[in-house]
Amino acid sequence: MDAFFFPAFQGEFRLLLGSKRSEMSPVASRGGITNLWRHEEARPTKFLGLLEFHRFRQKMGHKWPSEAKKAQKNIKMNHVRLERARRLLCSLGACIRDAVVKERNKGKRNFANVAGVTPADTIYRVDRISEAAILSWFDEKWPFSWPVELVYEGIEGEPGMTFPRGTPTSKTMFKCIIDPIDGTRNLMHDKRSAWVLSGLAPQKGSATHLGDIAVAVMTEIPTSRQWRSDQLSAILGGGPRGVVATAVDVRFPARRTRPVTIVPTSATNCLHGFASLVRFFPEGKILTSKIEERLWDELYRSKARPLVPVFEDQNITTGGQLYGLMAGHDCMIGDIRPLVFAKLRNASARSLVCHPYDICTGLILTESGGVLEAPDGRPLCEPLDTTTPVAWVGYANGALARQIRPALRRAIREVLG
């Protein structure tokens, strides 16, 4: 009777009325305290009996099913759910990567054709390939019981895209922000890897922000000369052990994954290492260079060291920058373009900055032991959209953050006011 009566709701009710030893505790992230909870002990429990069901109805004020469904929607993400979400986003990233690689292997040479222009960015044909893969994947793979709103460049001027299709945004449980291809120009010129970036957060409407992201995955789209594609993922509160790094050989149809080791540098200074402030475009180069010069002068220049051996690497993808910090390649990377362009009063350069979808995998860096914050040290709390400018600084470890942060603040204040 019990098994017949409640199979569809069994898993959800266990979180509410399951084992007495199932404790819930808040989880903090560098993006601020996030309103998520981890299920610290999950063990088999029996199916809910009729008495327990009626008790639940009493809690809901006898308003089944509408109130019960609302309660089901508001149940916080536990560890099992987080891991499931991780696997789903890893599958999504692999799907987009494979679609782009397959199209490239056909010998197509029109990746650089402009397909459209949005407030967030210019959309190229290669972006449309990835977007088609996204929609197909969500139709086929995303759990029907997890209604989700999608946010990615190309649809910001359209009504909210949700899955299952047609679900009102107000009825969704999650918000998934995606950068289908971070580094489109890298792929167009076959210059450097691009990345598929995705982050999942509990739905809070327009209040959902970067600090709410609970699962993040980044998947490498390699150049035509490169056989290996890395994929990194993390869940909130998992720490370094919860960061999963794998690689596949994209030359063969069988995508066999193998673990790889990705560790941030343990350096305590930037000498003889890589550290950069972003300046991809002519706009703002002079101001950014002044800030950087003052920074290194204060930290490292002296009579005994008239030349400062700190190198820079202008990787034009935010995903690639984060990967550099996580993989031990870089000590510090800062993207202060929104501050510089504001000083220049250059409104037309608004699209030439980092946006939330670019930095949505910052959780992987912080769970790896790195630091990600605003230039003034605040947590990143920009809304999960495709147009809000984001200024950020990433450090490979806490020691580097403590050394560089005060000097960087002073340099920014002296140059930009």
Where are these regions (language model features)?
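Short, low-complexity intrinsically disordered segments enriched in A/P/G/S/L with frequent Arg
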Residues: F13, K20, G31, L36, ...
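N-terminal subdomain of lithium-sensitive/metallo-dependent phosphomonoesterases centered on the IMPase/IPPase/PAP
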Residues: W64-I181, A399-L400, R405, R409, ...
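An extended, acidic
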Residues: L89, G93-I96, V100, T167, ...
